[in-house]
UniProtKB/Swiss-Prot annotation:
Organism per entry: Staphylococcus saprophyticus subsp. saprophyticus (strain ATCC 15305 / DSM 20229 / NCIMB 8711 / NCTC 7292 / S-41)
Assigned keywords, A-Z: Amino-acid biosynthesis, Histidine biosynthesis, Metal-binding, NAD, Oxidoreductase, Zinc
Catalytically driven reaction(s): L-histidinol + 2 NAD(+) + H2O = L-histidine + 2 NADH + 3 H(+)
Protein name, UniProt field: Histidinol dehydrogenase
Any one Gene Ontology cellular component term annotated for this protein: cytosol
């Protein structure tokens, strides 16, 4: 169905992507893990994943063995992806002292980080690379991965990615319970400073509940893409861009925006023609039934405005002049320009992390980067000469705020000199 911008904004845009009924369930899970530690984790593995886990931690040798079992072409693919991610993240890392000679900022890596790697419907070695590599470039001392247990063990491809990226520990536990374990620490899992990585609604709510106890990257909703297209776009490619997003899960959201209503109708027909032939059809069909939107706009300005209001995780511009949109599309997780920059390349190998804000949160937050694994603090290191130029201002402001001990803290330094060598 094709709808216009006004109807879309009124009826569909602000729908919540999270099920509020899950929040009390997640709270109970987290509290149970806090109180009962490893025993709770083993019970949840049995209850939710039907897997009995005597050992929650995966032996490190298992990672190397998994890597060695992989076909050489898969090892090469993982290594190329890792190399591109590493190179890009090194290029954007905050490393230099910023500021002036007497006021500046310093950066330090976090000590312990936990990474959630989804499992279940698919294996996600790419998530390992798109998170752990960033933490390693930042200089994080200890990186723990949690991922749901499986009857036949964690897939080799995921363990091999952990080996390549340099993970320190892997634990077979998933869901809200794994987030709680990393936040509180258990007999086996270490308490971490920050948790990153995408997951389902249970994972998202666990992060929300535990934020403050531990740092988080974001509270992620279902994956999403918004595309702006014109008659230069290849509709077969656009259809598969839609399918690629929709196959993540039934809640994944896809938006296609165009000034050309006839083109949107052609795309709708193309999607229906190809759909019976694709893999993972049932998941894609469910996503398209409830969360797929073809939106007609009147002009360039409306297209950009709508994209900024949707603020999607992924924005793709497939028009005759995609770079025209570069400074007008502002609030997106990542922006993909042109035919040869499909969103899927960003999922695996481009370089920026594929852990991105969803559900309009790109209007105020950013995708994961190496700098999310650094702390930043200001350093104030004044000489007496500089102090003498600013102390009166500080005293006046302290006085007007009636913070008289603040004022006295400055006053005492105007009457007593301290021998130093900064003058």
């Amino acid at each position: 169905m094709i709808i216009d911008k006004t109807l879309f904004l009124k009826k569909y845009l602000n729908q919540s992507s999270l099920n509020e009924d899950l929040y009390p369930i997640v709270k109970d899970i987290c509290e149970n893990v806090r109180l009962h530690g490893d025993d709770a984790l083993r019970n949840y593995n049995q209850q939710f994943d039907q897997v009995e886990t005597c050992n929650l931690e995966v032996a490190y040798q298992t990672l190397e063995n998994a890597y060695n079992r992989l076909d050489s072409d898969l090892r090469e693919a993982l290594q190329q992806s890792h190399a591109r991610i590493q190179s890009y993240q090194e290029s954007i890392k905050w490393t230099k002292q910023q500021g002036t000679s007497d006021c500046y900022e310093l950066y330090h890596p976090l000590e312990r980080v936990g990474v959630y790697v989804p499992g279940g419907k698919a294996s996600y070695p790419s998530t390992v690379l798109m998170t752990v590599t960033l933490a390693k470039v930042a200089g994080v001392k200890n990186i723990s991965v949690v991922t749901p247990p499986q009857l036949n063990g964690i897939p080799d491809i995921v363990l091999a990615a952990c080996y390549i990226a340099g993970v320190d520990n892997v634990y077979q536990v998933g869901g809200a319970q794994s987030i709680a374990a990393l936040a509180y620490g258990t007999e086996t899992l270490p308490k971490v400073d920050k948790i990153v990585g995408p997951g389902n609604q249970f994972v998202a709510y666990a992060k929300k509940y535990l934020f403050g106890q531990v740092g988080i990257d974001q509270i992620a909703g279902p994956s999403e893409i918004a595309l702006i297209i014109d008659d230069s776009a290849d509709l077969d490619a656009i259809a598969y861009d839609v399918f690629a997003q929709a196959e993540h899960d039934e809640l994944a959201r896809t938006f296609v925006i165009s000034e050309d209503e006839a083109l949107l109708k052609q795309l709708e027909q193309k999607i229906q023609h190809i759909l019976p032939q694709i893999e993972r059809q049932s998941i894609v069909q469910a996503s398209l039934n409830d969360n797929h939107f073809l939106i007609h706009v009147n002009n360039f300005s409306e297209a950009c405005d709508l994209m900024n209001q949707i603020a999607p995780e992924h924005a793709s511009i497939q028009t005759v002049s995609p770079h025209d949109y570069l400074n007008h599309v502002r609030y997106v997780g990542a922006l993909f320009l042109g035919y040869y920059s499909p969103e899927v390349i960003g999922d695996y190998v481009a370089g920026p992390s594929h852990v991105l804000p969803t559900n309009q949160t790109a209007r105020f937050t950013n995708g994961l980067s190496v700098n999310d694994f650094l702390t930043r603090h200001s350093v104030i290191d004044l000489s007496k000469d500089t102090f003498d130029t600013v102390e009166l201002t500080a005293r006046k402001l302290a006085h007007v705020e009636q913070l008289y001990n603040h004022e006295q803290s400055i006053e005492i330094r105007t009457s007593k000199e301290f021998n130093d060598d900064k003058n």
